[in-house]
Amino acid sequence: MQNNAPDDWEDDLNPWRVTGIRTPFSNAWLTIESSEVVHPDGKPGTYSVVRIRRLAVGVLPIDDEGYIHLVGQWRFPLGRYSWEMPEGGAEPGEDALDCARRELAEETGLRAAAYQKVLEMDL
């Protein structure tokens, strides 16, 4: 679908008004922005957003026999060991496919004969 909207159309439609932004936390992976806003109903408030700084890529490797290869590791935020698909963050300028190839090789030692994009989402 082609986007024929003028460059400023979102500004005209946005019912939120931002009166200030601060960054209470930032590291190599994410930034937290805290915005002072006026809600669409006119009430003031604070709206905080976590912005992911790097493209994240996951690979679900399925071999010729139908086996799925997962990697296991201790996840500090979960407080437990977790089995998961090979995944990681792209280096600056690295595209998703190159990142997927690199992460698969780094985490499993495997190389895929083919890749199929299944999902892309904004977090």
Positions of predicted regions on the chain:
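Acidic, metal-coordinating catalytic segment for phosphate/diphosphate chemistry
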Residues: 20-58, 63-64
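A short coil-to-beta-strand element that immediately follows conserved catalytic motifs
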Residues: 17, 111-118
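Acidic pyrophosphate-coordinating catalytic loop
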Residues: 23-27, 76, 121-123
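Conserved Nudix-box catalytic region and its N-terminal flanking loop in Nudix hydrolases
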Residues: 2-4, 8, 13-15, 50-53, ...
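Short helix-to-loop capping/linker segments positioned immediately adjacent to catalytic or ligand/cofactor-binding
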Residues: 107, 118-123
